[in-house]
Amino acid sequence: MTTIEIAGRLVGTGQPTFVIAEVSANHGGDLPRVLEMVRVAAAAGADAVKLQTFTADSMTLDVDLPRFVVGAGNPWSGRRLHDLYREAAMPWDWYPEIAAVAASEGITLFSSPFDPASVDFLVEQG
């Protein structure tokens, strides 16, 4: 396995485990909740917190066609995919405050972008 460096830490064979706390859609549309998740992850000893950067429009079409509605047999039955992705997407204007809290807590922050616009946004954020 290749050894890589993430935020000054070596990651690879023979290196200590690099623990990543995944926030993704667990924010529930609540910025204070995200900030608390970052603080708790840092206090628990995680090395990094990972977000997901996307918009509903970059994930699916905003249509009512049957193939874009969740089928029976799961908790989201009858829900439109676009609505679910809109709820799961983290507002981009939250990122500066999340980054500031992560920096103050000494935990690395990064995100998985899902489309070119998200990549551009994250590059702009530093």
Predicted regions and their residues:
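Active-site beta-loop-alpha junctions enriched in small/polar residues
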Residues: S24-N26, Q52-A56, F114-P116
